[in-house]
Amino acid sequence: MAFKVVQICGGLGNQMFQYAFAKSLQKHLNTPVLLDITFFDGSNRKMQLELFPIDLPYASAKEIAIAKMQHLPKLVRDALKCMGFDRVSQEIVFEYEPKLLKPSRLTYFFGYFQDPRYFDAISPLIKQTFTLPPPKKIVKKRGRIPPQAFFDFSR
């Protein structure tokens, strides 16, 4: 498998942690990492990471199926899982699992990865990515208020 896939889901905060994990995975494994954004297809939530200059590509349906071994019959997937050859990570929420950033047969990662140790090595890059540009200054026009802007309440 020449790539890894990280599921992006939840609100903006969760998406930011998942993206930071994906970037860290890319750096640690020197492997292409794709983002699975299919969660948003049937959700009221929106993919909000696009507010930032993210640079990881989105995974196609075929790439997701390959990463999750969905191209194999369910019986074969279940047998491989029982033998320890599962390629989908367990859901990770708050705990830190350093083995996830090491080479393994895992190809699909889902969870929230809400521990900064996942991206300590690339912290400056993550901070730069998620720093919003300064707001544009609003230039106030000085001058006379046009007569049509007044309303006479005395009538």
Regions found by a protein language model. Give the residues of each.
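Histidine-anchored nucleotide/phosphate-binding helix
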Residues: Q15-K27
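Short catalytic/ligand-binding loop motif for oxyanion handling, primarily in non-cytosolic enzymes
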Residues: G13-Q15, G42-K46
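A short, glycine/small-residue-rich beta-strand->loop->alpha-helix junction that serves as a flexible
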Residues: Q7-F17
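Secretory-pathway luminal glycosyltransferase catalytic domains
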Residues: K46-R155
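Extreme N-terminal starter segment of soluble prokaryotic enzymes
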Residues: M1-V5
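A short beta-strand-loop structural module common to alpha/beta enzyme folds
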Residues: T31-G42
